[in-house]
């Protein structure tokens, strides 16, 4: 599997990097950590080309270099990568420019597969979308944003599962809230949820929510299948059938001490644009991490 962790700053991206690497370890996934900076001007791009053989002299995006330096130090400190015994510093001259707006360095992983550090410049949605397509990414991990449209566009336009790291504290005692129904992505979400629960030793609440007064048979069958799968996987769990508004029930159940896992909406892109989707609304409303599985 391949994970992409998007980081923006040393001050705000620690929870994203922390949780992202822990989940990647659970999946034994290859990981790319990407910083997306502002678009470089045509003049700056030509300067980058002249300096591509020695990126120590590249001052075009010093913030990006500093953020990758911080990520590198985190990886070394937590033993996610094998550091250079002669020099534990982040060596920028190892960065290789692959495009006008992209450079990278690949490191040998210890608890995951290969770890890549990537710097891109340009529109964040387009850059992350291109990186996901380029690397065949399975899960993109991002921090929560106050810009509602940004999360909406990431969920709609990026062709991978999306893990939104919101209000995460590594010392908090979490449970896992798993949304179960008869939608196409539910079985994949259940399998992802099991991997996360195993890695973090989480109790799982597999919840099926109906906004009508009756549970249709397909919902009941999905709940039974989830119960069987969790039991066979050896996961400590409970299965619940609940009547009520989906967003409200998820919010009241999750609070701030759950990690939510749910399948992506099957609505058309046009319908999502005008009306939104349940996963998007849950990720906005609930004050906890949420994994939306595609």
Q: Which residue ranges define each predicted feature?
A:
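Gly/Ser-rich helix-loop-strand patches that form or flank binding pockets
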Residues: 11-13, 17-19, 117-170, 254-294
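Conserved beta-strand termini and adjacent loop/short-helix elements that scaffold enzyme active sites
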Residues: 34-36, 120-122, 165, 207-209, ...
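Aromatic/hydrophobic pocket-lining residues that form π-stacking "cages" and hydrophobic walls in ligand
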Residues: 20, 71, 128, 193, ...
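Small/aliphatic-rich secondary-structure junction motif
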Residues: 1-61, 76, 83, 174-240
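Short, solvent-exposed amphipathic alpha-helices that sit
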Residues: 63-71, 94-102, 192, 218-226
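Short boundary motifs at domain starts and secondary-structure transition points
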Residues: 105-109, 165-172
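Functional cleft and adjacent loop/helix regions within the main domain
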Residues: 58-62, 69, 87
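Structural beta-alpha unit
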Residues: 73-140, 231-270, 288
């Amino acid at each position: 599997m391949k994970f992409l962790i998007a980081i923006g700053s040393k001050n705000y991206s620690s929870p994203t990097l922390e949780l992202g690497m822990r989940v990647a370890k659970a999946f034994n996934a290859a990981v790319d950590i990407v910083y997306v900076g502002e678009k470089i001007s045509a003049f700056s791009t030509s300067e980058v080309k002249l300096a591509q053989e020695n990126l120590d002299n590249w001052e075009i995006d010093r913030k990006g270099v500093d953020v990758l330096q911080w990520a590198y130090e985190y990886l070394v400190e937590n033993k996610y990568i094998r550091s250079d015994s002669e020099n534990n510093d982040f060596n920028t001259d190892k960065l290789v420019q692959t495009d006008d707006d992209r450079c990278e360095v690949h490191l040998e992983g210890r608890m995951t597969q290969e770890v890549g550090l990537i710097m891109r410049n340009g529109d964040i949605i387009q850059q992350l979308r291109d990186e996901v397509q380029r690397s065949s990414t399975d899960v993109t991990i991002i921090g929560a944003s106050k810009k509602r449209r940004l999360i909406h566009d990431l969920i709609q336009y990026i062709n991978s599962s999306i893990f939104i790291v919101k209000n995460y504290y590594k010392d908090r005692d979490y449970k896992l809230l798993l949304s179960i129904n008869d939608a196409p992505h539910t079985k994949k979400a259940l399998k992802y949820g099991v991997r996360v629960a195993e890695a973090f030793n989480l109790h799982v609440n597999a919840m099926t929510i109906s906004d009508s007064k009756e549970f249709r048979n397909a919902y009941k069958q999905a709940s039974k299948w989830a119960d069987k799968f969790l039991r066979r996987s050896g996961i400590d769990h409970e299965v619940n059938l609940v009547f009520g508004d989906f967003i409200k029930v998820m919010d009241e159940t999750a609070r701030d001490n759950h990690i939510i896992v749910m399948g992506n909406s099957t609505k058309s892109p046009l319908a999502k644009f005008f009306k939104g989707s349940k996963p998007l609304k849950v990720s906005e409303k609930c004050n906890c991490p949420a994994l939306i599985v595609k």
